[in-house]
């Protein structure tokens, strides 16, 4: 079962000084859908879920599901560093209308590969929604090895992996062992290389800013037009370097504020982008648009 093909946006959570900025969130959701993305991912890394209360998360899920109104799938981050909490959140967000769940590997608790299989088995068997495994070892300290995903892909409801290890060799092995499950790049700069090897698309940070471009690029790759897709990837890559010159989502929120799409407000310990790096990002955006 494929939840989407091509581009899903790892959506930011816009904040005001007093909480979640729902006016901006609604505009961002419409902006994404009107520019042809295949799905929305909320409460992920880019969405600053780690700094949000459970009540805020519940309200964001309810709002996003209603705002999307069935136009695209809404995929909700429901991971935790302990299995019991991840099961509870996955059930909760499923009951609120999530179309699928993005479940990051347990963080801080550095489990073994067999622990990963047990963890995802508990979660996937507790819900009736598709589950996407989220592998981002630079943040979690745990890496889902390709052979482990081969086992995970056989679990009922585990339908995909967001592979953000930044390693094309590992990604190629994961794709080879994934069976019927989808592999999505979690690294914007590796989208087209991954899709050339059989990945189904990307869960993208850059699409917050340029959703139509990323969507068009992934559609070209899906259609086998790799020359066009590669040309677009090479045009995008300098901008991607700027968008990750500081910890995500610091640069993307700066850029979205520059275009009037949301305020440049982050929650501690994240702080706003340095002037030196924001000046460089301004130039990269101008170059991309020229």
PLM region spans:
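Catalytic alpha/beta core domains of metabolic enzymes, predominantly
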Residues: 125-126, 139-244
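Glycine-rich phosphate-binding "P-loop"
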Residues: 135, 157, 267-268
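Active-site beta->alpha loop and helix N-cap motifs at the rims of alpha/beta catalytic domains
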Residues: 2-9, 13-141, 150
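Alpha-helical structural signal in soluble globular domains
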Residues: 59, 63-68, 92, 96, ...
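C-terminal alpha-helical cap/extension of soluble enzyme domains
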Residues: 6-14, 31, 35-37, 196-199, ...
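Alpha-helix N-capping/helix-start residues
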Residues: 17, 22, 54, 146, ...
